[in-house]
C-alpha cells in the first residue's frame, strides 16, 4: 500500500478534490492550501479517486458531478463503499445549479452541493461546515 500520505493527530484537515477540469481543481487546491487551514490534493482522472483517497486519507472529498469516464455519483458510491473511506463527507461541485440553489441547501443523494464557478467564500464556508471536526463548532 502506498504510504506517501499519513494522517497525524492535530494535522490540518485533508481535502481531496476530484475534478476533470484541471483549472478548477488547481484553483480550489490553491485556495484551500493558501487558507492555511487545510491540505489539499487533486485528482483529474475520476478513475483514480479511490486509489488516491485510500493513500491520501481525506477528511472531506469535493467531487465534480459531471465528468467523463465516471460521474461524481459513481465516484461517491465507490468512496462510500470502501471500508477505509466510508463515512468521509462528500460535497458535489457542479454547473447544474445556481449559487442561490446551492445556498438554499439543495442536496444530491444526501450530499451538499457547491455551484461552479464557486465563490471563494462559498467554497471555504461549505468545506468548513462539512468537516466533521468543524461542523459542531
Where are these regions (language model features)?
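His-Asp phosphorelay/catalytic-motif detector in bacterial-type signaling
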Residues: 57-59, 84-89
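Non-catalytic signal-transmission and effector/linker regions of two-component phosphorelay proteins
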Residues: 1-16, 119-137
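Active-site residues of response regulator receiver
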Residues: 64, 94
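Acidic catalytic/metal-coordinating carboxylates
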Residues: 44-48, 71-77
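Two-component/phosphorelay signaling modules centered on CheY-like receiver
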Residues: 22-41
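The feature encodes the CheY-like receiver
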Residues: 68-69, 98
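Acidic, metal-coordinating helix/loop segments flanking the phosphotransfer/catalytic sites
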Residues: 42-60
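Alpha4 helix (beta4-alpha4-beta5 surface) of REC/receiver domains from two-component response regulators
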Residues: 74, 97-115, 121, 125
Amino acid at each position: 500500500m502506498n504510504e506517501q500520505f499519513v494522517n497525524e493527530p492535530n494535522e490540518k484537515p485533508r481535502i481531496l478534490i476530484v475534478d476533470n477540469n484541471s483549472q478548477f481543481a488547481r484553483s480550489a487546491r490553491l485556495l484551500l492550501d493558501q487558507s492555511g487551514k487545510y491540505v489539499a490534493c487533486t485528482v483529474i482522472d475520476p478513475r483514480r479517486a479511490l486509489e488516491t483517497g485510500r493513500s491520501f486519507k481525506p477528511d472531506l472529498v469535493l467531487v465534480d458531478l459531471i465528468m467523463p469516464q465516471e460521474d461524481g455519483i459513481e465516484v461517491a458510491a465507490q468512496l462510500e463503499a470502501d471500508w477505509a473511506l466510508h463515512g468521509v463527507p462528500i460535497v458535489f461541485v457542479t454547473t447544474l445549479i445556481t449559487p442561490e440553489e446551492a445556498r438554499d441547501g439543495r442536496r444530491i443523494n444526501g450530499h451538499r452541493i457547491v455551484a461552479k464557478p464557486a465563490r471563494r467564500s462559498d467554497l471555504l464556508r461549505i468545506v468548513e461546515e462539512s468537516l466533521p471536526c468543524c461542523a459542531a463548532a
